[in-house]
Amino acid sequence: EENEGGIAHLRQGRRDDGVLTLGEAMAQLDASAGNTLTPPDSEYNEQLEKLRAVLRSYKEHNEDVYGYISIPAVGLEYVVVQGEDNDYYLNHNYKKESLVIGSIFVDYRCDDSIAKNFNTVLYGHNIETNGGAMFNRVTDFLKKDVFDNALICIYTMDGVYIYQAFSVYSTRPDSGY
């Protein structure tokens, strides 16, 4: 049942969508490749290639996979998708399965390359369960210490984009922003 497959597991304080965090997936790649020493100057390129391998595996399940978002300071890590509209992923996971909590997704009007966008807009439900889930954790940016220190990392096939918040605004869904 949809509700039991989504919200019930979130209430138990764990993700049950079968998605490894990016760190877990990269650790699996490390383990399967064995421990090999690489020169320090190649470390960035090696990590980027591991990242791309993980993203390719997500894209094998769904061509709509855009990337991955990580905000370590608030414990947010999710696959990011981009659909043909801004409605589909409101209630579907990255595997295109029906899920009441939906996915974090990029506005359909954005380019598939962050570098080509003037603004890249991400959406996700503000669902609060057992300490927060989905984009509810972004509300922690209202706390000064989080706002001042948290980095927002978005990983795509193009590369790694690291942001620091410069403004936080709380609004209601019907505010007409």
For each feature predicted by the language model, list its residue ranges.
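Solvent-exposed, non-transmembrane regions of membrane-associated and secreted proteins
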Residues: E1-Y177
